[in-house]
């Protein structure tokens, strides 16, 4: 969408105080669209806003952005918050080193660079030499690096970029001996990396869209093989399955180029797995699994032994061992059985395995032998989030550790002594010891025990009037663990409390916890979030006049649903890039892929009724006094299309019966969030904090 100043919208403001304004909201384009679901008619008056290319929609977007900017830019705390956000983000950030073809690589950000830069080292800890700087690919940081893949001979680097936050990807190839890019260029790739094999690589893509590239439904995912030195139009179609147009396909190849895996996903919460013996050029794929409701991931191949991470027969995950000779699941052997804690991932290093578990939403890691023997727990600094990096043939093993107030610190782990030492530690731009984090457990509506983290200043008086930023997600088997973001620090310094609730729908306690927040149990997620808010009020951390709820994507749905169900409970609501139209979400881009978690309005009358019962867009009521609401979206969000936020904003503005503002912030040259330039992140967070605090009377 081209968001330009198509006309100047006259703003009428009643007073100079930003929170005491009379809002004359822009008139949104409407029509008389009515859809019929199982005999029930549902009006969709703002359907024209689904066309983000129309002149009417662009005019409305421009007018809404003018109104929003006029409000936000006048908030007295914004300059101070913006300045502090830049200060706390301005520190050197170094990732975990990794080795490819006997060369060490690392990502580094000098401080306020929009994107981190890939470097190589002459030796571990040695001089850094620039390999790839995404900041040089655009003037404003809106080209992001989405993935890299080294050829098995070490000469080439295929790198994947995305422009303006879109899910659409392009692939380029760099010759590491000369440092120059080849002429090879792949467009319209999506959801996959380059898988090297022979003199080229495999990649996943869709046909080039004829129009509406950022909203039209993506169908028939294909795998191509690209031979270096040729044009994309000459690429060989390697695999497609038109019988199942709503599935994703991707291949990976082991480093010896003896085994290829094909992953098929998209119609269930898991995937199918296929394997092919590349030693025999006439070999075909052999199906290893046939259950799209379970997850199967080949995490390592040693010879013809295949180590597979799965939740099949193990809701909290386990590690299985297969062999190319008999690869079917019935011949697999259990290597590490399911534990009482959730297994998150497995890293191979120096002839060992590191198994990373989650216990009450924090990392607990253990060293294992290759035959599945537990050799002891790896001591971590505190409650937090650890991420390991290593190679089965390398002595060196690293992990990054962070918590809510601990910036990512890289440790080198010795598998022989089972000890860690700091490899790199950032210099904090704030006083870390002034904050405290505690974990509490509260009871949800149906009696379920739910964990929650709270972070705040040690000297904070819990007087029941502290500003609270309550964050949640609750979906798609994704766990929220403690992790560091400098963006939180200014809010905490202002006396705010950051709260992260571990709702059902995530993976905090395995597949059962996930399923308890899906389809016709989705209300559990909203009940968990509402119960978290009520617990915070009952325990004198805050009151309803100082409580903000925030969530993005599926978390935006969470905020939208809670806003409509309990408008009396919250002072401020921030639904970010949210799924807000639950009756039509599956009609756009890859929305169909979310059906295993949500169900669709076409599944059955019962499913339609359930979705209609909580869909944020369809549960707004005229004349209700809704909380102050700042809706955020972006023009290039082709994951959750901006139409969700557009229609929700227009409807909420028309329904608002109170005096609290209802604004929408529509970013340009941005997408769903991944790869967003640091400068844009800082500007957005300054807007959010200033909006929250202003509407709490701060």
Task: Please annotate each region the language model reported.
Residues 1-22:
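Bacterial Sec-dependent N-terminal signal peptides
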Residues 55-149, 160, 247-277, 283-301, ...:
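Non-catalytic accessory segments flanking enzyme active sites
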Residues 104, 154-158, 201-202, 260, ...:
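Hydrophobic beta-strand positions that form the internal "hydrophobic ladder"
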Residues 109-116, 138-142, 161-170, 185-189, ...:
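A flexible loop/linker signature enriched in serine peptidases of the S9 family
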Residues 120-121, 172-176, 219-229, 274-278, ...:
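Beta-propeller blade signature
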Residues 130-193:
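A conserved hydrophobic secondary-structure block that centers on an alpha-helix together
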Residues 135-148, 161-166, 180, 413-419, ...:
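Cap/lid segment of the alpha/beta-hydrolase catalytic domain
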Residues 500-698:
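Active-site-proximal cap/loop segments of hydrolase catalytic domains
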């Amino acid at each position: 969408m081209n968001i330009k100043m198509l006309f100047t919208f006259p703003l009428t403001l009643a007073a100079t105080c930003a929170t005491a304004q009379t809002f004359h909201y822009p008139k949104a384009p409407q029509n008389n669209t009515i859809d019929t679901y199982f005999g029930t008619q549902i009006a969709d008056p703002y359907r024209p806003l689904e066309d983000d290319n129309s002149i009417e929609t662009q005019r409305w977007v421009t007018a809404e952005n003018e109104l929003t900017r006029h409000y936000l830019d006048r908030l007295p705390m914004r300059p101070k918050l913006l300045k502090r956000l830049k200060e706390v983000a301005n520190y050197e950030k170094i990732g975990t080193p990794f080795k490819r073809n006997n060369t060490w690589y690392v990502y580094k950000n000098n401080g306020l660079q929009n994107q981190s830069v890939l470097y190589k080292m002459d030796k571990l800890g040695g001089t850094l030499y620039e390999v790839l700087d995404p900041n040089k690919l655009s003037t404003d940081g809106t080209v992001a690096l989405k993935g890299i893949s080294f050829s098995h001979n070490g000469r080439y680097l295929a790198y994947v970029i995305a422009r303006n936050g879109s899910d659409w990807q392009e692939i380029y190839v760099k010759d590491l001996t000369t440092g120059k890019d080849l002429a090879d260029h792949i467009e319209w790739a999506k959801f996959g990396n380059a898988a090297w094999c022979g003199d080229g690589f495999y990649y996943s893509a869709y046909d080039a869209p004829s129009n509406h590239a950022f909203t039209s439904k993506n169908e028939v995912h294909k795998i191509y093989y690209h031979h270096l030195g040729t044009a994309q139009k000459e690429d060989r179609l390697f695999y497609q399955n038109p019988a199942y147009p709503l599935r994703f396909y991707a291949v990976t190849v082991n480093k010896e180029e003896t085994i290829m895996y094909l992953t098929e996903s998209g119609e269930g919460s898991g995937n199918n797995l296929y394997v092919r013996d590349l030693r025999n050029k006439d070999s075909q794929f052999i199906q290893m699994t046939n259950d799209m409701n379970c997850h199967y991931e080949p995490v390592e191949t040693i010879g013809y032994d295949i180590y597979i991470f799965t939740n099949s027969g193990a809701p909290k995950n386990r590690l299985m061992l297969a062999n190319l000779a008999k690869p079917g699941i019935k011949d697999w052997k259990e290597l590490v059985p399911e534990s009482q804690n959730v297994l998150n991932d497995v890293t191979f290093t120096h002839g060992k395995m590191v198994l990373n578990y989650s216990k009450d939403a924090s990392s607990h890691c253990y060293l294992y032998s290759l035959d599945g023997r537990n050799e002891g727990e790896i001591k971590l600094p505190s409650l937090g989030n650890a991420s390991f990096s290593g190679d089965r043939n390398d002595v060196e093993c690293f992990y990054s550790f962070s918590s809510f107030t601990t910036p990512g610190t890289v440790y080198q782990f010795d598998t022989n002594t089972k000890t860690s030492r700091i490899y790199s530690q950032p210099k904090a731009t704030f006083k870390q010891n002034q904050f405290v984090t505690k974990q509490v457990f509260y009871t949800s509506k149906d009696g379920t025990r739910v964990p929650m983290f709270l972070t705040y200043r040690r000297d904070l008086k819990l007087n029941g009037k502290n500003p609270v930023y309550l964050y949640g997600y609750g979906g798609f088997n994704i766990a929220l663990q403690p992790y560091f973001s400098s963006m939180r620090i200014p809010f905490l310094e202002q006396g705010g409390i950051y709260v992260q609730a571990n709702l059902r729908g995530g993976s905090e306690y395995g597949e059962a916890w996930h399923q308890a927040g899906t389809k016709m149990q989705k209300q559990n997620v909203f009940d968990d979030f509402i119960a978290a808010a009520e617990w915070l009020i009952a325990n004198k951390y805050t009151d309803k006049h100082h409580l903000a709820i925030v969530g993005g994507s599926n978390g935006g749905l969470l905020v939208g649903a809670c806003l409509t169900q309990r408008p009396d409970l919250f002072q401020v609501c921030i639904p970010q890039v949210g799924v807000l139209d639950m009756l039509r979400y599956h009609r756009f881009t890859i929305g169909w892929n979310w059906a295993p978690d949500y169900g669709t309005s076409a599944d059955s009358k019962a499913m339609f009724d359930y979705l209609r019962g909580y869909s944020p867009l369809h549960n707004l009521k005229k004349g209700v006094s809704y909380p102050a609401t700042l809706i955020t979206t972006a023009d290039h969000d082709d994951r959750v299309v901006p139409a969700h936020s557009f229609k929700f904003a227009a409807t909420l503005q028309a329904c608002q019966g109170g005096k609290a503002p209802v604004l929408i912030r529509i970013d340009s040259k941005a997408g769903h969030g991944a790869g967003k330039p640091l400068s844009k992140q800082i500007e957005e967070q300054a807007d959010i904090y200033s909006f929250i605090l202003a509407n709490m009377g701060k």
